[in-house]
Structures are given as structure tokens and as C-alpha cells.
Amino acid sequence: MAGAFRLPRGAYQRQYAWGLHETLDVAAMQAAADRLTGRHDFRAFGRSPRPGGHTVRNVQEVKVSGAGDWVTIAVAADAFLYGMVRRIAGALVDVGRRRQPLEWIDSLLGGSTTGLRLAPAQGLVQVAVEY
């Protein structure tokens, strides 16, 4: 994906960011994120951590928020597939760039992987694990 990896220099900005250098449509990204909430088969978004494991996951929330030049994507789920959050982020960014329509998210949930990109791992930060 286009973009540059930026390493913030400030002591309080030690988390990594995926720098895109373009404006994203945050409202479209949130509309796409809303389609991902609930219980779905996320096989297009990743693979099970166990061979033959199921790919159905319950996503409680996907929140896209923007402040100035920053856009944050937060995902909460009962469990994740390998690579799932990176693919969700990549899909939402493509919708935000207007490279894909909202309906594309529905096709991904239907199992299509056409056009699905993997966001770089550098921009991801695990915030919490709850049991």
C-alpha cells in the first residue's frame, strides 16, 4: 500500500504510525466499520490460529476516529484471526481513500478477497487484553 512509515520523535509519541499523506473519509470508514460489527465469518480477513479452526468471530466494536491529521481505528472482538486487524485496517483505509465502495465490505464478509490489502504491522498497537 502507498504510504510511508513514520517514527514519531516525541517521548509521548513512541507508538508507531502508518503515515498515508492523504485525507481519508472518516465517515465512510466508520460506515464500513459498522458493517463489520457482529458475528460474521471473517475467513477473508485472516486465518485461524489452529489448522482447521473456525473463522467465525464476534466483533463487538470497530471505531474510527479522526483528529487533525490522525485517524485511529480501534477493534474489539471476542477473538481474532491471524492478520485480521491488519486486513480490517487495510479495508477501512481503502474505503476512506474512496478506492472501494461500502458494499465491498459485504463481499469480503461473503468470502471474497478481491482487492483486500494488508495494513503494515508498524502502525498497530495492542491496547488491552480482557478475560
Protein language model regions, located:
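Structured-RNA-binding interfaces characteristic of tRNA pseudouridine synthases
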Residues: 1-131
